[in-house]
Amino acid sequence: MKAELIAVGTEILTGQIVNTNAQFLSEKMAELGIDVYFQTAVGDNEERLLSVITTASQRSDLVILCGGLGPTKDDLTKQTLAKYLRKDLVYDEQACQKLDDFFAKRKPSSRTPNNERQAQVIEGSIPLPNKTGLAVGGFITVDGISYVVLPGPPSELKSMVNEELVPLLSKQYSTLYSKVLRFFGVGESQLVTVLSDFIENQTDPTIAPYAKTGEVTLRLSTKTENQALADKKLGQLEAQLLSRKTLEGQPLADVFYGYGEDNSLARETFELLVKYDKTITAAESLTAGLFQSTLASFPGASQVFNGGFVAYSMEEKAKMLGLPLEELKSHGVVSAYTAEGMAEQARLLTGADIGVSLTGVAGPDMLEEQPAGTVFIGLATQNKVESIKVLISGRSRLDVRYIATLHAFNMVRKTLLKLENLL
């Protein structure tokens, strides 16, 4: 199915507002398995809007118009579409009642005749109630082409799409089911290379790689009748993908860490800490508290995190954590010694089960003859103190700090998974 989005409003063309509705609608259509082929913006002009609707009707199966449903004369989307379809405008009873209720709480004089326009729908259409505003939307199919009219304000549009349009379209068309696989420790180019035969020959299910800062996701999607069939198809494909190895011979299953569009290494780690009733602390240098603030962003963080340390200078590392200053000077702050000492002292001082530390060179300049992006991450438990060295090259200072934090969460996550295997 080919869909087209038409944004109506002169303010979009003049740059007064950004058309965020287009991104939102495109994402929602993709989730439903509906391909958006065209996006058009047109001003508040009947002649030009008629021309755009005519063109869209010749090349698309689903035409979605957003904006121009308000009470003023330049709000002419429904009127113009009705004219194109040779349909009358009629009043929707529910929308009229909402207008009555709205103005009953205000001065009678505030209700003017033009407000009634917001309760109109195209004859024969399915009204789409507006939970957060007054302008009713609508859905109608004529000569095999479906048309949707939606309000322009994003808060009204999103509510109407999520609560009214998506359920309606799901009934009308086959549903697209998706599963998002998340990877850390492998780049997008390498992942695409080792999975090239799957990607090049894909039909159904489909595979869509996407790179984010420090990690990669794969969206697996299939169009099918129900969730059970989708789970079977996507599960089989997932097993095949994770059986592959990186160019270094590492199983992809080892760099896969979880599912979901909104998931993260931090969330996975937090949930494991809660699951096994473990507490954690951190001593941070180059990340300056980013690890701790990320952890504290989850509701219930106090179950696993009571506090930690931010020690930027060598002197503060010695003062706050009780590390020998002469040893720090000897080994340098960018070293395995310092990372391990910070992690262990943080654990001992707070009584946490796990101590993690981050020290290194955020950049852009070198430090202690170490290039920008050099990071040491320490991890201490009751039984072991260890560290890893990572090089995050060619990145901004902000990215180095963020990706270093991802490495720290991943290190803790792997430690907790080893604990899981011992239970």
From Swiss-Prot:
Record Gene3D superfamilies: 3.30.70.2860, CinA-like, MoaB/Mog-like domain
Top-rank lineage group of the source organism:
Bacteria
Q: Which residues cross the membrane?
A: none
The record's InterPro entries line, in alphabetical order, gives: CinA, CinA-like_C, CinA_C, CinA_KH, Competence-induced_CinA, MoaB/Mog-like_dom_sf, MoaB/Mog_dom
CDD domains, sorted: cinA
The Swiss-Prot or TrEMBL record describes its family as follows: Belongs to the CinA family.
HAMAP family per the UniProt record, alphabetical = CinA_B
Looking up NCBIfam families in the UniProt record yields: cinA_nterm, molyb_syn, PncC_domain, PRK00549.1
What is the name of this protein?
A: Putative competence-damage inducible protein
This protein's encoding gene: cinA
